[in-house]
């Protein structure tokens, strides 16, 4: 079954999503959450940390593997979702809502895909926001 991809978000080839709001929120796609399996530990950048597009800024550990969290943008982290640190499974349960990871003031963007481009590349299904 194809995983949902929200139409109002943009995506990196590393499976992170970026919202259009300011500051922008970052999370992992349902495609990534499904591939990871049950997320059991999350390491996020701290508020105030500088992140760089295409560079690791944290880790997601699941029952299957440990994966780098790669920032889709360059900027400064302004907020971290402590709820996913306390309850990492929220990423699997609601990757586009309560499972967001951090918010960032964007200085520059990496190579981002539209929802349609991401869905075509990773065999997913675009759904309305």
Residue locations for each model-derived region?
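Charged, alpha-helix-enriched surfaces in structured cytosolic catalytic cores
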Residues: 72, 86, 113
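Acidic, low-complexity mobile loops and tails
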Residues: 1-56, 89, 93, 97-129
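ATP/adenylate-binding site constellation spanning eukaryotic-like Ser/Thr protein kinases
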Residues: 23, 71-74
């Amino acid at each position: 079954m194809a995983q949902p991809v929200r139409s109002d978000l943009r995506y990196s080839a590393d499976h992170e999503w970026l919202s259009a709001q300011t500051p922008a929120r970052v999370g992992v796609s349902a495609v990534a959450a499904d591939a990871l399996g049950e997320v059991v530990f999350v390491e996020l950048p701290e508020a105030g940390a500088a992140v760089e597009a295409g560079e690791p800024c944290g880790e997601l550990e699941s029952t299957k593997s440990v994966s780098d969290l790669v920032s889709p943008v360059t900027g400064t982290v302004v907020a971290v979702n402590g709820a996913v640190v306390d309850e990492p499974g929220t990423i699997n349960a609601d990757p586009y809502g309560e499972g967001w990871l951090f918010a960032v003031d964007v200085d520059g963007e990496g190579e981002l895909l539209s929802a349609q481009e991401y869905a075509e590349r990773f065999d997913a299904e675009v759904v309305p926001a």
